[in-house]
Amino acid sequence: KNVYKSYKNIASQFESNRILNISGEYHYLYKCSECKTLDGFSKFKSRLFWIVCGYGERPTYALITSLEIILIFAIIYLFTGISIGGRLINYRLSWFSILEKKIILVDFLESLYFSLVTFTTVGYGDIIPTGTSIILSSIEMILGVTMVGIWTATLARKITR
């Protein structure tokens, strides 16, 4: 149970001696160990910080989380509705047995493109969200801005060490 305190002390020693790369690794171990002792909302927050950026020590976690967000929203958009040049994509689960796999793949790629463009807040306007997708695309934009900032900050922190 006190292992996390040892990691914290080791991280502090490396940091005070300006050995920042190793200090960062021990900080990561400290936070991972500390998470095991937490409960409730504190544990939830700690796990979220681990998933999103590896406690500020793993920029690839932010990149992977971003890709997962884009993929999840792309799938959701297939069911909540997007309009491409007047053609509405708004699937129902029962349609999967009727539709050709090629059509589903093309629609998924269009949805993935829309999700990526929305996440990066480019928003070309060639695909328009409809219905619930309007709210979801706003949420994805906010997540996109946040995740790009987290990834940039985490990467800059690692590079400057």
What are these model-derived regions, one by one?
Residues 40-80:
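Transmembrane alpha-helical segments and their cytosolic interface motifs
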Residues 1-39:
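Disordered, glycine- and acidic residue-rich low-complexity segments typified by the G-patch motif
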Residues 13, 66, 142-145:
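Residue-level hotspots within the lipid-embedded alpha helices of multi-pass solute transporters
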Residues 67-111:
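Outer-pore turret/helix-boundary of cation channels
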Residues 99-161:
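Pore domain of cation channels
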Residues 35-47, 94, 103-110, 130:
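Coil-to-alpha-helix initiation sites in intrinsically disordered, low-complexity, charged segments
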Residues 25-28, 50, 114, 137:
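Short amphipathic alpha-helical coupling elements at transmembrane boundaries
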